[in-house]
Amino acid sequence: MNAKLRKIRKDLVQRLKVYKARRARTKSKATFIGITGSSGKSTVTELLGHILAGHGSVHTQVLANSIRALVNMLSKRALTGIDYVVFEAGASGTDTVKPMGDMLRPHVAVVTMVRLEHFTAFRTLENVAREKRMLIDALRPGGLAVLNADDPHVIAMASPTQHRVATFGRSEWADYRVTDIHAAYPDRLTFSIHWRGGVIELRTPFPAEHFWLPTAAAVAAALELGVPQEKVAARVATLQPLANRCEVFVVDSGPQFILDAAKAPWHSIHLAFDMMARATVERKRIVLGQISDYAGSTRKYHYAYKTAREIADQVIYVGDNAHRSGAGQDDRDAGRFHELRTPREVSDHIERTAVAGELILLKSSSNLHLERIALAWKHDVKCWVPVCGKREGCVMCGLFEVPFEEHRNHVRGRRRARRWQHFRRLLGAGTEPI
């Protein structure tokens, strides 16, 4: 009976949140921008929010990209006086974007690319494209669709549509045509965009060439929204990139890390490897953990090793699939390849063998939290459980300096402290002189 009552209460609370969210959306005078795509959407969201923050007041919702997150944001966030709301819409399965589109009713929708991520849920590129298109279909009358001109599945969303369309890409006919792409770490990404207003030269904080795509998408959207070209270029140059998305992590008198351990879909593994191949440092190492979203056999780990071996002085595989590399005994004996089971073992190995100035790529799906290997150079990392089950990164979690078995009590303690502080504020407000 108690369980039934709890369910009824939970349903009522959620319905109230949805009602408040819809009411807040209806009353808001902000320009709503929705961003989706198989990859790059988080960077577009963060960068576009950063650009618009130099032009007006902005609320940016990044990484928390579900309908529940959208409802919570709209129902709890005061949008009065906000000029722009930038929201990342993720697709974890079929019919997950449509509810967000219906709730958001965006003035602008951006689609970065269509790839076969979440393979189990979608199975085909056509199914992925159909899901992403739902954000375009949700545009308000007279809305703007910002589309990748180089992706046939994305550009197909331009027709049939009643909305304005702006395209970006390397295609000659793109409205925002990208040229002169260059990145070779430590040189950061630079490129040019040719558009109807002229040419905009961009200097970014990103270490890899493939970030031209999300940067171009954000720039195209900002220019279409009326942000001056000079302000766009200045804001792009000052962005603080998202943690663990090709994040540069430099240790004084120690190694340099590129942390790319938030996701590792098979379709984009080569982009991280290409970044390492272009880097102009003397010594390179690649640490590869879990690969996700691939069809076919686990020989993908073997293919990845063959590519990584041509780029790096040493390749380290870690996790439950480390044995699938196909590395020969000669490579193992020569130290070209190491097969380790846990992030802690990798951390210890790198600590013993690190060379000042070397570049180390940490690449994996988020389940292994390989970012701990780099964090251990600047923090006393005590959470070394191989797989903790948490989806957010270690920095966002904030408990990497606390042993995993103490996390629950630590979180409870923080909640109690927040409640007590709130209670004291209430008492203080009530006892102040009138």
Which residue stretches match the model-derived regions?
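Phosphate-binding loop of NTP-binding sites
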Residues: N2-A149, H153-Q162, A376-V381, V385-P386, ...
